[in-house]
């Protein structure tokens, strides 16, 4: 196995945010991308510079906004939603990797 991709939605303020997270074979984040952002504000979470801070994270990593993850002024709900979604995806991928190895 080379890696995994995880596609999901999180709820923004009023609309879903569709995102993808890419993992290596050990469950570490290799990249992430906002596929579709539907809210009128807060679209800065689609910026690849912001998304790059998830690189190398796993389910064991810290995801505290303001220290581990940069906040974005005016995009608090979107930042929280995407961060929670990516963190959740790391748990799902870890579970899948454990199941594969059993």
Feature-to-residue mapping (PLM):
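Flexible, solvent-exposed loop/hinge segments and secondary-structure transition points
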Residues: 1-80, 84-102
């Amino acid at each position: 196995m080379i890696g995994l991709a995880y596609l999901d939605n999180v709820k923004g303020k009023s609309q879903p945010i569709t995102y993808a997270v890419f993992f290596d074979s050990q469950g570490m984040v290799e990249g992430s991308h906002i596929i579709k952002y539907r809210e009128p504000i807060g679209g800065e979470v689609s910026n690849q510079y912001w998304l790059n801070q998830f690189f190398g994270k796993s389910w064991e990593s810290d995801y505290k906004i303001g220290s581990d993850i940069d906040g974005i002024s005016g995009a608090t709900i979107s930042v929280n939603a995407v961060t929670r979604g990516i963190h959740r995806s790391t748990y799902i991928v870890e579970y899948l990797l454990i199941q594969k190895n059993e």
